Amino acid sequence: MQKVLDFLKEAGTYYLATMDGDQPRVRPFGTAHIFEGKLYIQTGKVKPTSKQIAANPKVEICAFKDGTWLRLCGKLVEDDRVEARKSMLDAYPELRNMYDENDGNTQVFYFKNATATFSSFTSTPEIITF
């Protein structure tokens, strides 16, 4: 899991795919954090992303760096504890001008049954599950 987190942070931007009914939706994201041994991402409850995850928690992330790409798929599970939201915002203090762990909007999810695949054109794919 740490290798996945490191890759996402080094890539800077990754792309999160969700489903909106039968229409795929993809958008850039940047938050990734390990808390209590789980990989978390963050969004706001007022965003369409939140509603799409609630309707279908199966998502996929894609990131690219230095000729290698990462595809991470799994189910997102909301963690509604203040401690989880605070940990994420402490890791990304620049988000505190938009979010607060007690604002009723900040939302964090962790990956469950995740499969991460690192691929490139020059090596065999590496698969990590968590």
Could you describe each region identified by the protein language model?
Residues 11, 56, 92:
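Acidic-histidine catalytic/liganding microenvironments
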Residues 32-67:
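A short mixed-secondary-structure module that forms the rim of ligand-binding clefts
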Residues 6-20, 59-61:
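A short, Trp-centered hydrophobic/proline-enriched beta-strand micro-motif
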Residues 1-2, 43, 47, 93-94:
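Charged, amphipathic alpha-helical segments
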Residues 71-130:
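Charged, gly/pro-rich active-site loop segments
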